[in-house]
Amino acid sequence: MIGSLWLPAGLRGEIKNRIHTLRQRHSAWGEIKWTKVSRNRQDFYFELIDLFVSYGANFRFRCIAVDRAQFNLALHLNDGELGFYKFYYQLLHHWILDFNQYRVFCDTKSNRDPTRLPVLAQCLSRANLSSTISDVQSLPSGEVVLIQLCDLLLGAASSRINGTLNDGTVKAAVVQRLEAALDRPLAPTRKAEEKFNIFKIRLQGGW
């Protein structure tokens, strides 16, 4: 699965400051990651979920779930990296609205082909002529708290979609907190869903 966050540029500093305040309150200074969710930080992760939900449609999450059994590598020149960036394009393209300007920050990835991000930016710009893609850059997740929060939300969605949650665990509690706040289970959504969109892509076509 691939995930992303969407937020107005004007809220970026405010949200980062609020997360910093939560870190101080809970003495939680390590990298925020789904794989690091633990019982002794449960309240911290609960409050991160609450913070995300509190902004409504001004702070959104979207992910694409790909069924590996349907993925035909031959359609991507037998290049898994190329296939990844095609899905990355689909993830971002449907969030770009006319007459807006966008900056895209990606988690740093060791690419065999160094042109992946410039080509992604070019494809997004050509497909959205009435919008401006001013920047597409990679940053190390350990230094970018919003990329870390995206990892947390992606892990929650992935664990529910893939059926890997174990009852009674802190991860299950975090997912339940998110589902309660959204007032629905984490499951594939309609295309129009704004707040927490889970796109289970059908590689044969259709939503």
Predicted segment positions?
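Phosphate-ester processing/binding pockets and catalytic centers
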Residues: 1-207
